[in-house]
C-alpha cells in the first residue's frame, strides 16, 4: 500500500507499507527551477553521512536517477513539540559530526541552496523575496491588497531601515567580500526541528535536498527564526555559546549576527507569505498563511530594534 504523506512544490513524499515493512519514497520534481538538482543533493549528502557513520538519518535503499526517485528507510517517531536543552545538544553534535575533519578541499560539494557567502548575500536573500512578493500580488483581490499593504507599511520600511544601518557600518567592498572557503561549514541547510523526528530519546534528522557549504551565521539565523517552532531566549543563548565553542574559528562575521539576523527575520516573513501561492485556489488557506505571517512579524519584531 502506498499513501502520500506530503505534497510540496519541490517533491512528493509517499509512505510504502507491506505487512511489517515500511519505507519512504521521495519523488523530486524535475521541472522546478533551481540552481542545483535536489535529487542529487540529497543522494550525495546521504551517501556522505553514511561514510561518516552518522546513523540518525534515513538510509538509501534504492534510487532511480532518471526518474529522480529515492527509496529511504522509514524512521518511526514524532515531532518535537517543546524544544529542550538536550535537543539543542543533539543538534550541535550532529553539526559537529558532519564537519569533523570535513573541509572544502576533501569534500568538493556545492554551496547550499541560497548560500550566503558575503554580507551582501544576506541582504539580497531578503531583498529578492520582497521584490518577488510585490510582483506576484498585483491583482486587486482582497488577499493581494492585504499582502501589498503589509509589505508597504511594515516589511519595506523595516528593510530600508536595516539597509541604512548596514551601509553606515560597512563599505561596499566589505559588504561584497566573499568568505574564505575555510570559513564555510557544511550545512544541512533546511536545518531545524521541522525536519527532526524524535524516537526513544534520540533525534533523527531528515531532508537534505538543500545541503551544501554555507556561512555558519546563516545556519544560526535560520535555526533560530524558523516559524514552525519556538526556542526560548535562554536556550538560544545556550546554543549560540556552544556553537561558537565548536565553530569559533570560522565565525569571522560573528559581530555582525545582530544585523544579519534582522534581514533573515524579514526573509522568513516573506517565506510564509510565499506559501500562499501553493494554495492559491483555497481562499481560507491563503488567509491562514497571511495571518501566520502577520502574527509571526508582530510577535518577533523586537529583533528589528
Residue ranges and their predicted role:
Residues 5-20, 24-25, 164-219:
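Active-site acidic catalytic loop and adjacent metal/ATP-binding pocket
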Residues 103-189:
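An alpha-helical support segment within catalytic cores of ATP-dependent transferases
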Residues 161, 166-172, 200-202, 237-256:
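Short amphipathic alpha-helical segments and their helix-coil junctions
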Residues 4, 14-138:
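ATP-binding pocket architecture of kinase catalytic cores
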Residues 270-305:
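ATP/Mg2+ or Mg2+-diphosphate-binding catalytic cores
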Residues 216-249, 262-281:
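Active-site activation/catalytic loop segments of kinase-like enzymes and analogous catalytic loops
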Residues 77, 203, 211-213, 226-229:
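Activation segment
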Amino acid at each position: 500500500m502506498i499513501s502520500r504523506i506530503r505534497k510540496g512544490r519541490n517533491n512528493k513524499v509517499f509512505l510504502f507499507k507491506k505487512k511489517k515493512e515500511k519505507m519512504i519514497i521521495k519523488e523530486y520534481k524535475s521541472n522546478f527551477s533551481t540552481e542545483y538538482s535536489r535529487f542529487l543533493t540529497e543522494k550525495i549528502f546521504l551517501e556522505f553521512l553514511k561514510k561518516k557513520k552518522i546513523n540518525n538519518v534515513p538510509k538509501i535503499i534504492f534510487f532511480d536517477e532518471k526518474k529522480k526517485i529515492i527509496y529511504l528507510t522509514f524512521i518511526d517517531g514524532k515531532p518535537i513539540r517543546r524544544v529542550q536543552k538536550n535537543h539543542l545538544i543533539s543538534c550541535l553534535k550532529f553539526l559537529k559530526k558532519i564537519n569533523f575533519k570535513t573541509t572544502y578541499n576533501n569534500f568538493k560539494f556545492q554551496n547550499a541552496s541560497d548560500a550566503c557567502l558575503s554580507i551582501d548575500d544576506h541582504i539580497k536573500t531578503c531583498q529578492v523575496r520582497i521584490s518577488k512578493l510585490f510582483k506576484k500580488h498585483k491583482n486587486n483581490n482582497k488577499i493581494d491588497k492585504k499582502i501589498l499593504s503589509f509589505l508597504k507599511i511594515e516589511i519595506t520600511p523595516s528593510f530600508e531601515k536595516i539597509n541604512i544601518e548596514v551601509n553606515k557600518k560597512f563599505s561596499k567592498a566589505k559588504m561584497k567580500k566573499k568568505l574564505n572557503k575555510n570559513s564555510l561549514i557544511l550545512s544541512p541547510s533546511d536545518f531545524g526541528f521541522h525536519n527532526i523526528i524524535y524516537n526513544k530519546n534520540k533525534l533523527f534528522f531528515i531532508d537534505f535536498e538543500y545541503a551544501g557549504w554555507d556561512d555558519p551565521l546563516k545556519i544560526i539565523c535560520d535555526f533560530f527564526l524558523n516559524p514552525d517552532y519556538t526556542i526560548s531566549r535562554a536556550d538560544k543563548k545556550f546554543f549560540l555559546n556552544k556553537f561558537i565553542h565548536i565553530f569559533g574559528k570560522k565565525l569571522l562575521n560573528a559581530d555582525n549576527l545582530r544585523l544579519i539576523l534582522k534581514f533573515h527575520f524579514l526573509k522568513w516573513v516573506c517565506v510564509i507569505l510565499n506559501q500562499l501561492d501553493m494554495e492559491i485556489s483555497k481562499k481560507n488557506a491563503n488567509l491562514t498563511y497571511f495571518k501566520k505571517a502577520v502574527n509571526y512579524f508582530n510577535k518577533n519584531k523586537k529583533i528589528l530594534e
